[in-house]
Amino acid sequence: MSLLLPIGTAALSLSPAERTSADEQLLEWHHEAAGYKVRHVPATLPDVLKTKRMLDWEYASVRERRLPEAFSAMQDQLQWLSSGVSDYEIAVPVHEIESCAAGTAYYKGVEKSVRYEQLGFIADQCDQMFPRLRIFLFDAHRVFSSPVTIFGPNLAVVYVGQCYLAFREVERVKSLSSHFDWLVREAVVDARNVSTHIRSLIER
């Protein structure tokens, strides 16, 4: 369930970010944006591109494990992405990829085979779905972003941990779109080179 709150001329929708209701809500937003470009800054690696083994590791610490439902939701999102209904741009801090490759920070304790399979899958999807899927890597020492998704010109959603803040006021959506454009301009690895960069990290 979401709650609409008036903020000036805008409407702010608060939706719970708990699995798996959040996954269902995200899929609804993706379908709503059919035909429009979707832009996304994930909290970690992009959920839509996570492998089952990576999700299994992430869910290991969750009290009520709902991995089957979560993986099914991710598969639905990946199928939507593969359909080519919308172009999809993702901006990820380069240190996120490097940490996954090295098994440091958030990925400390993840088996090497799990981490490398995950990165290999992302690289493969980049090759197979380019240019409708474009991933850019930015340097978080130079630029920063909270997790956010812009669903075309009419909806932008910011992730704040326990809930999603969804903005539908045009100027707010434009502002977040401009923010994403800034991340792309400042990218240290362009979408054309991301798969090569990722493979270089796991082939060392």
Indicate residue ranges for each PLM-predicted region.
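Hydrophobic protein-protein interaction segments
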Residues: 30-203
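Basic, Lys/Arg-rich alpha-helical nucleic-acid-recognition elements, primarily the DNA-binding modules
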Residues: 1-16
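Short coil/turn segments at secondary-structure boundaries
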Residues: 13-20, 193
